[in-house]
Design a protein with these regions (language model features):
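Non-catalytic, soluble scaffold/interaction modules
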Residues: 1-204
């Protein structure tokens, strides 16, 4: 507070010396205190397809870092996603129905308030839900178009806002050849995609 740099900054920005520094005091919640505690991340809409459905993952008895670190395999939030992935573990919707119902309600409120698809971080401590953070979620070009169109239909945003929300630069990803999602296929490997589109042929 009394360093030369701090004093200069206050002088430039017209900040009085008598104000002093401020401190944020926040409650710490723990998702790693037992089997009735979880931590997770979720989107209010599917960030890949734009479908209006909760999409996300959670870990039992874990902290936030564990969900994204890749050291443990997270479980799906919804029963539908868990079933589609043939997951053995129960979804949060099945294992914590009351918490899931509450989470779904607050997620909807956040999306309506911010008028955009939300990326939410949450923790459940001893079966009590804590919403930690929310922000506008990143999405694919396909999802961006669907979400924008759907939100106009839902009267959340105007047509002008919808057009402005679709970045022209990402539309290029829609022009690449892709695999038919409905086609029958034999899965030989799984992984995380690093680029848009699909290709076939001999790798040399």
């Amino acid at each position: 507070w009394n360093s030369k740099r701090a004093k200069k900054y206050r002088k430039i920005n017209y900040i009085p010396d008598h104000w002093g520094t401020s401190v944020n005091v926040q409650t710490m919640v723990f998702g790693n205190m037992g089997e009735n505690c979880v931590t997770g991340v979720a989107f209010t809409r599917n960030p890949s397809t734009g479908e209006k459905e909760l999409f996300g993952e959670y870990l039992i008895n874990a902290q936030g870092e564990d969900v994204v670190a890749g050291t443990r395999t997270p479980q799906y939030i919804t029963k539908k996603a868990s079933k589609e992935a043939n997951a053995k573990e129960l979804s949060m919707e099945e294992s914590m129905p009351k918490v899931f119902k509450e989470f779904k309600k607050f997620s909807k409120k956040l999306e309506i308030h911010y008028r955009d698809m939300q990326d939410i971080e949450f923790t459940v401590e001893n079966n009590k839900l804590w919403m930690l953070q929310t922000r506008s979620g990143k999405r694919t070009a396909k999802a961006a178009i669907k979400i924008a169109v759907d939100m106009v239909k839902e009267k959340l945003i105007s047509t002008k806002e919808a057009v402005l929300r679709v970045d022209p630069n990402i539309l290029d990803t829609l022009l690449h050849p892709t695999l038919d999602e409905k086609a029958e296929k034999k899965i030989i490997a799984t992984g995380l995609p690093a680029s848009p589109g699909a290709a076939s042929g001999k790798v040399t």
